[in-house]
Amino acid sequence: MADAIPKNGDFGSFMLQKISELERKSGIRLELAQKTLLVDNCTTEQVLSVLTGSTVRVNVLEQSENETTISRESVILGDTDRVLIRAYSKIFVCNLPRKIVYRIRQKQLGIGTIIANSQLETFRKIIEIGYDPVRRSVFRRYQIIYRMNVAFEIREELTGI
């Protein structure tokens, strides 16, 4: 889904077309919850809570850092500890306020919760939606933009939703 949304186009119609293409090419039929998560550009944790009707939590499995980026692998778990989403994040520390980077380094909260709690004004740009036949999961890749710079690049695999 690397195509750009037409300037005078409708994001909803564009995403419907991309989801139809994904279903056709991969031979799968997506549930409404999966479609919602693929196109959503709000906080994934909040949307998952609404869709599942329960509290979800983020568990950071692995996190490493170099001078310019933090790489993170995490899962979002439902109330029965079932993995709903597996996320791989690349965080560009030079494009974020220090307090945000500090909270990320603590590994206690999900990125969406950190952004929401800090009232950081961001924009999410969906770069790709697809299907991984090996893992048998639908995924999306998106960027979170802060002050016109890419602050996060995230790939989410919808494993249990």
Q: What do these predicted regions represent?
A:
Residues 1-132, 138, 146-161:
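N-terminal domain-onset segments
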